Amino acid sequence: MPTLGVKGARERDKNSASGAGAGAGAGAGAGEKHRKGPRTTDPPKTGWALTKQRLVALSPTLRQRHLLFGDFLDDIGKVASMFPRESVELPYDMPDPRTWSQALNLPSEHQNRFLGLIKAAEARGRVHTLRLRYTRMRAEEISLLIQKQSSARAAIRLELFLPPQLKPTKIPDPLDRHERRRVETILEEEVDGNIFPR
């Protein structure tokens, strides 16, 4: 796509060549964008390399952009052949009617997937809680066995042979009160007549 300075210069050249005055050329250049007429099907000319006068007339940002990307504009035909448009033969794109029916099913599928993720996370949390409860109860049982020995020697011997006591750590809840309430309402929602058990 030509830069604004190049496009304006080309429009002024066309207007001056057709015999219009310089003041009328600037006005026609602004309105030419909205004018409907026959589109030119000529391939873009390799005149992207501006003359020194036109290059000096450009603003600094446009000049820098042109100097950086001018090579790519020369190869516009090659780029168009490398990356062809998907619908070259069709002037308009007809949407696929199958996407309309898929769009209707997407929210329920998304909700089911989201519910599945929530259920899986809650199941993992339950398993982790059960493991912690088991280790805590086992540690309590070991300490009770050691306390109930008749002598200190028997208690030390039993303590040496039993596995070490694990201090249970309390896992903080990653959800705050508002998020936990939201998760519980989602899990208790009625979807298709079924209430998801917690």
From Swiss-Prot:
According to UniProt, the name of this protein is Protein LKAAEAR1
Q: Which intervals of the chain are annotated as region Disordered?
A: 1-47
One matching Pfam family, short form? LKAAEAR
Q: Which residue ranges have biased composition labelled Gly residues?
A: 20-30
- InterPro entries given for it? LKAAEAR1 (IPR029152)
